[in-house]
A protein has these predicted regions:
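Glycan-recognition and catalytic cores of secretory/periplasmic carbohydrate-active enzymes
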Residues: 1-138
Length: 138
């Protein structure tokens, strides 16, 4: 793992030990949760039944997946893995800019969309960490 100064040496060692598994986890979780039609990542997926439990798609899942894909792409030496990471990165980028960004309100994102693609009234997270934002009051 390339050191970026973002973590302590002990944290980077632990991350480095698990880094080889990250592209596999990324690919499977993306396959489980990405809804290509409406362009987003669902909130919950049941690993036993292989069904979406909550098809609401919060905005933040896409940039977080882009970050994971970028890390896996950067750290992988395998061309096939790098290509898969770029495909995930591209799909998330395109979905975010096509379906979540709102130019009419200074590029603010839609918080949550439903499976049909329309804006959902659902609040994407709990309000304890950031009461203003997560309640739509900020």
């Amino acid at each position: 793992m390339r050191a970026s100064g973002a973590g302590r040496p002990s944290q980077l060692r632990v991350l480095g030990q698990h880094l080889t598994h990250m592209p596999t986890i990324l690919r499977q979780n993306f396959a489980n949760g990405f809804l290509p039609g409406p362009g987003g990542i669902c909130k919950a997926f049941d690993l036993v039944t292989r069904q979406h439990l909550n098809t609401d798609m919060p905005w933040w899942s896409l940039p977080e997946t882009i970050r994971a894909a970028a890390l896996c792409w950067r750290e992988s030496a395998d061309a096939e893995t790098q290509q898969a990471c770029l495909q995930i990165w591209t799909a998330c980028h395109n979905a975010f800019f096509a379906h979540f960004i709102r130019p009419e309100v200074h590029l603010m994102s839609i918080q949550t969309r439903c499976e049909g693609g329309s804006v959902s009234d659902s609040i994407p997270a709990t309000a304890d960490a950031d009461p203003g934002y997560h309640t739509g009051l900020s």
